Amino acid sequence: MTTLGHNYDNSLVSNAFGFLRLPLEFNPYATDADWVITGIPFDMATSGRAGCRHGPAAIRQVSTNLAWEGCRWPWDFDVRKRLKVVDCGDLVYEFGDAQDFCDKLQDHAERLLAAGKRMLSFGGDHFVTLPLLCAHAKHFGKMALVHFDAHTDTYANGSKFDHGSMFYHAPNEGLISPAHSVQIGIRTEFERDNGFTVLDAGQVNDRSVDDILAQVKQIVGNLPVYLTFDIDCLDPSAAPGTGTPVIGGLTSDRALKLVRGLQPLNIVGMDIVEVAPAYDQAQITALVAATLALEMLYIQGAKRGDD
């Protein structure tokens, strides 16, 4: 992990503070944390505009604007009193060595899960989800995937390290069950017979939130769920700072309502990926990513009952 053997964060792309102004915890495996935030500054699998290695820092920086509220609207409790959350800084790996990255991220995730922690991760390009799925499946078994994106990322293009191929590899490796997985906000071409339920952006924008959530819950069933949110699921008007923006996406309001409605699911791991601050305007992409991350923590805190 970032700081093993050190008392500082030695990532070249991180901040000096954690998400929501949390202090950085340099030995997350030994803490009493419920959820551990990990920054994953990796964008070597990007096919379009690079730069999302700076996503974790951008999300953390703008999250300072969210830290002042005790109870985040519309919730009636302070998530920091319901959950013990720590930020362990950024994963450090040999830059230019994608295999070293995969090995170190999977090892870090396996150690956290073995210690009883859950993970909220900030990418980085979407390829980072694959080693995270490997670690989570080793711990929880085959999972359902709830995937927000403009792209299905199920493309069999023969590339080992590609941010468009993770969900082609994951079913083949037995990590997730496509029959119990749903992809939300899709608006690019994809193979129609890959086994996933695809809710394209047109129907997600036109149908009611309650109707969509009912379908998601039916598809997922009782399986453990991994939740992954590619920020390009949102329309570029809400999230311009990403590598492969696609017009016609979700609004931030609809995305927040959908994430909020996932509270009943057995979510065992979560990530937000593809924030590329070089293309952002007034930090709005980083802000919506940080807000979605906070919402993800709130749906976990809501399971804990009263303070």
UniProtKB/Swiss-Prot annotation:
Record Pfam families: Arginase
Protein name from the UniProt record: Agmatinase
Reaction(s) catalysed (UniProt annotation): agmatine + H2O = urea + putrescine
Similarity comment: family membership: Belongs to the arginase family. Agmatinase subfamily.
Binding locations of Mn(2+): 126, 149, 151, 153, 230, 232
InterPro entries: Agmatinase, Agmatinase-rel, Ureohydrolase, Ureohydrolase_dom_sf, Ureohydrolase_Mn_BS
EC number: 3.5.3.11
Hydrolase found in the keyword field: yes
Enzyme class: hydrolase
Gene Ontology molecular function terms on file: agmatinase activity; manganese ion binding
Gene from which this protein is expressed: speB
Gene3D superfamilies: Ureohydrolase domain (3.40.800.10)
Coiled-coil region(s): none
Alphabetic keyword roster: Hydrolase, Manganese, Metal-binding, Polyamine biosynthesis, Putrescine biosynthesis, Spermidine biosynthesis
